[in-house]
């Protein structure tokens, strides 16, 4: 039987794990928090989520067969998923706010060589535009010149990082500057008995 964990806290030498089916006590906890895809927080993003806007190329790529797809980001996920999405899309635009990518050079080189990909650097997406039912285009802006343009596309895949899902831990666990829990090589945290994978 599955239970939803609501809170994890240290209680003396034990941990108190509160769930939707009651409280559990244990001597150690292995916590696998994962993360939530970061959003662009722009007009139209929420409205067209699932109607053109996606955060998972593997999950949703096939819905864009022979369509124009856009990808936002500059890291490994954005670069690798842009290449993956060329299996489906007639064209893939990769939009990145900087001139240089943070992704591995090998992945970027493969992307540059792909004839179905057009890379647009120094740009951000300002708005997702649709017809009320589905996404139809993006409004993008050059971050150096402030020049705006519209890009016709029916898909937007957002790969701009993850927000760590660490809200269940109520004790002061050490985190890095991005909010991810810090562990040693044994996956131990600063709280004895709390392991993070």
Stretch-by-stretch model annotation:
Residues 73-75:
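Glycine-rich Rossmann-fold phosphate-binding loop(s) that bind the pyrophosphate
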Residues 27-28, 51, 66-69:
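Nucleotide donor/acceptor-binding cores
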Residues 78:
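N-terminal Rossmann-fold NAD(P) dinucleotide-binding loop
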Residues 3-18, 23-26, 87-185:
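A Rossmann-like FAD-binding core segment of flavoenzymes
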Residues 41, 46-63, 159-197:
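FAD-site-proximal beta/loop scaffold in flavoenzymes
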Residues 31-32, 71, 158:
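Redox-cofactor binding/interface segments in oxidoreductases and associated redox assembly factors
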Residues 82-83:
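Generic hydrophobic/aromatic pocket-lining and core-packing "Φ" positions
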């Amino acid at each position: 039987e599955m239970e939803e964990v609501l809170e994890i806290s240290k209680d003396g030498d034990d941990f108190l794990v509160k769930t939707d089916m009651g409280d559990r006590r244990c001597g150690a906890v292995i916590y696998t928090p994962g993360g939530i895809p970061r959003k662009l927080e722009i007009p139209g993003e929420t409205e067209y989520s699932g109607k053109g806007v996606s955060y998972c190329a593997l999950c949703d790529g096939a819905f864009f067969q022979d369509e124009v797809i856009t990808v936002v980001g500059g890291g490994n996920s954005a670069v690798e998923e842009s290449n993956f999405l060329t299996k489906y899309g007639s064209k893939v635009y990769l939009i990145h706010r900087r001139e240089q990518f943070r992704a591995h050079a090998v992945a970027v080189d493969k992307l540059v060589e792909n004839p179905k990909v057009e890379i647009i650097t120094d740009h951000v997406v300002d708005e997702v535009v649709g017809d009320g039912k589905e996404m139809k285009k993006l409004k993008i802006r050059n971050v150096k010149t402030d020049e705006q343009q519209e890009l016709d596309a029916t898909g937007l895949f957002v790969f701009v990082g993850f927000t760590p899902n660490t809200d269940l831990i109520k004790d002061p666990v050490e985190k890095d500057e991005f909010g991810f829990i810090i562990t040693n090589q044994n996956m131990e945290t600063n709280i004895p008995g709390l392991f993070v994978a």
